[in-house]
A protein has these predicted regions:
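Conserved beta-strand in the GNAT
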Residues: 44, 50-60, 65-78, 87-94
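Conserved acetyl-CoA-binding loop-helix of GNAT-fold acetyltransferases
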Residues: 95, 101-114
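A short beta-loop-alpha structural element at the N-terminal edge
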Residues: 1-13
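Short connector loops at helix/strand junctions that flank enzyme active sites
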Residues: 38-40, 50-52, 83-90, 119-121
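Conserved GNAT acetyl-CoA-binding A-motif
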Residues: 109, 116-124
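Active-site rim helix/loop that mediates acceptor-substrate recognition in acyltransferases
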Residues: 18-52, 56, 62
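OB-fold and OB-like single-stranded nucleic-acid-recognition modules
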Residues: 7, 33, 58-61, 81, ...
């Protein structure tokens, strides 16, 4: 099983999210303004060249783009000592049903954490 991880492939991430969250789980609209922000990192995973899953990770401040009521830093005790812009939120982790039960979600999470840290995250 050849696994490839990429960042910046929003169209592929959108496809996975549409299938998993909208078609399978029935959410009406899976997308928001955060998806379009250049600071939002979309991670996609491929198995033997075939799209299998995705996630997104972004600076906490972007959450207020979608929700003006989102909490301000520090949101929890773990945030103490972490500067604005150093807390990232990971979400929208999804794996296509045909690719599940292979440990792929954990690989997506690991890649998302690495991408966030590369972007300056200290707390995810």
């Amino acid at each position: 099983m050849d696994i490839q991880l990429k960042t910046g492939c929003f169209d592929d991430a959108a496809l996975v999210r549409r299938v998993v969250f909208m078609d399978e789980q029935g959410y009406e609209n899976e997308f928001d303004a955060i998806d379009e922000d250049p600071n939002c990192i979309h991670v996609t995973l491929y198995v033997d060249g075939e799209l299998a899953g995705c996630s997104r990770v972004f600076p906490e401040e972007l959450e207020r783009v979608a929700d003006a009521e989102a909490p301000l830093l520090p949101a929890c005790d773990m945030d103490e000592g972490v500067a604005a812009g150093e807390t990232y939120i990971m979400g929208r982790v999804a794996v296509l049903s045909t690719m599940r039960r292979r440990g792929l979600a954990s690989k997506i999470i690991e890649a998302s954490e690495a991408a966030a840290r590369d972007a300056g995250a200290k707390l995810i």
